[in-house]
Design a protein with these regions (language model features):
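N-terminal beta1-alpha1-beta2 module of alpha/beta enzyme domains
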Residues: 35-108, 207-209, 323-326, 331
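An alpha-helical appendage that flanks or caps ligand/catalytic pockets
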Residues: 44-49, 159, 163-204, 234-345
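Flexible, glycine-rich active-site loops centered on histidine and acidic residues
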Residues: 46, 51-65, 120-187, 234-235, ...
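Hydrophobic faces of well-ordered beta-strands that scaffold small-molecule active sites
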Residues: 52-58, 84-86, 113-115, 142-146, ...
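Short, acidic/polar
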Residues: 64-75, 130, 213-223, 298-309
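Acidic (Asp/Glu)-rich catalytic clusters
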Residues: 77-78, 101-109, 131, 135-141, ...
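Conserved, mostly hydrophobic/aromatic
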Residues: 80, 104, 134, 177, ...
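Alpha-helix-loop-beta-strand connector modules within alpha/beta enzyme cores
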Residues: 97-114, 173, 334-345
Length: 345
């Protein structure tokens, strides 16, 4: 129980989520260590059950035959996973998320469809139209995590932007997207975008269509607090996640905002056994400061333990991804579902 002990060590500052026979419940107001007592004036005395949800991320899925991708989506829905996710990269050969998620929506009826969507490098009006129409066609099943893109120089070049501009471009674009999705006619003259008497139709089925954010730098955490609807980091420990959650909520208070306590999730990579040398090297390149086994559980018990620790840290949405593609996707989903879906509420 390494992860849980770390979180509870921080209990006086970060607080606790208590459990009941009905599921995961926010701690009562006045409970010692209540998370929402971190000096932010938020009153969550009307406690509510945390809705635990599990999605599945298909990274590098561009090599999948279309029949297998279709079956993967059908299996996810049949097994009662909450969502399927396609990260966006420019050069890795993965599916284009807008195209593939349109197909996923057509293959399913209830499965939510999501992407880590790169905003910098896109035209705001076109992106607003594309996402609004995908949400409309999927009958309100679209989920979006807005990202600036990978730090790799080739990826940045493929976006057609200057690396140092990406955060500012996203900051300027997000309010434009929200106004367009709300049905406004938009005029805007900014550093990166010029918009004149612009509006879109049809509007998204979801009102509002939410934008979640990731990231770990202080600027990224402040961005979530300032303009985000939710936060979903990756490649960090539950202890680090608890600290980041606190920073997001403190930032939100500075901007007179509240982040819904249900809107904290994590990108969680797992392995079916000891990490391969390639997987270890890849993880160490991204996080050289930490043992990869602290980030990636390598057994069913380890996966359940780290999920438990993330729940204790106040996170309730999980995007699960195998560290390497399985030999059989259907069998992998069956096994994964048997391990985690009993926690879904």
């Amino acid at each position: 129980m390494v992860y849980r002990s770390r979180i509870r060590f921080l209990g006086a500052r970060l607080g606790l989520i208590r459990r009941s026979s009905e599921g995961i419940v926010l701690a009562n107001k006045g409970t010692k260590g209540c998370y929402y007592s971190v000096g932010n004036g938020i009153d969550w005395s009307d406690q509510g059950k945390m809705k635990i949800r599990f999605g599945f991320t298909c990274r590098g899925s561009g090599d999948l035959p279309i029949e297998e991708f279709s079956q993967l989506c059908i299996d996810l829905e049949r097994l009662n996973f909450d969502s399927v996710w396609l990260p966006e990269t420019m050069l890795t050969g993965s599916f284009d998320p807008l195209v593939a998620l349109t197909h996923a929506a057509a293959c399913t009826e209830k499965l939510k469809i999501g992407s880590h969507m790169i905003l910098p490098g896109r035209a705001p009006i076109r992106l607003a139209r594309e996402l609004a129409q995908l949400d409309r066609l999927s009958q309100g099943r679209l989920l979006i995590i807005a990202v600036i893109g990978l730090p790799d120089s080739a990826e940045v070049a493929a976006q057609g932007v200057i690396r140092s501009d990406r955060g500012q471009m996203m900051d300027e674009m997000v309010p434009l997207l929200r106004r367009l999705w709300a049905g406004e006619t938009v005029d805007h003259s900014g550093t990166f975008y010029e918009v004149t008497e612009a509006s879109i139709t049809p509007l998204p089925a979801q009102q509002p269509l939410e934008l979640w954010f990731g990231g770990s730098l202080p600027s990224a955490l402040r961005r979530v607090g300032r303009i985000g609807d939710g936060y979903i980091p990756g490649l960090c420990t539950p202890e680090e996640g608890a600290e980041k959650k606190m920073q997001v909520e403190i930032a939100a208070k500075e901007f007179n905002r509240l982040i819904d306590p249900e809107h904290f999730g994590v990108n969680l990579t797992y392995s079916r056994g000891p990490l391969s040398s390639d997987a270890r090297e890849s993880l160490l390149r991204r996080r050289p400061d930490i043992d990869p086994e602290q980030l990636v559980p390598t057994s069913a018990g380890g996966l359940q333990e780290i999920i438990d620790a993330w729940i204790d840290a106040g996170y309730s949405k999980f995007l699960l991804r195998p560290v390497e593609p399985p030999g059989n996707w259907s069998e992998e989903l069956e096994e994964l579902g048997s391990e985690v879906l009993g926690l879904q509420s």
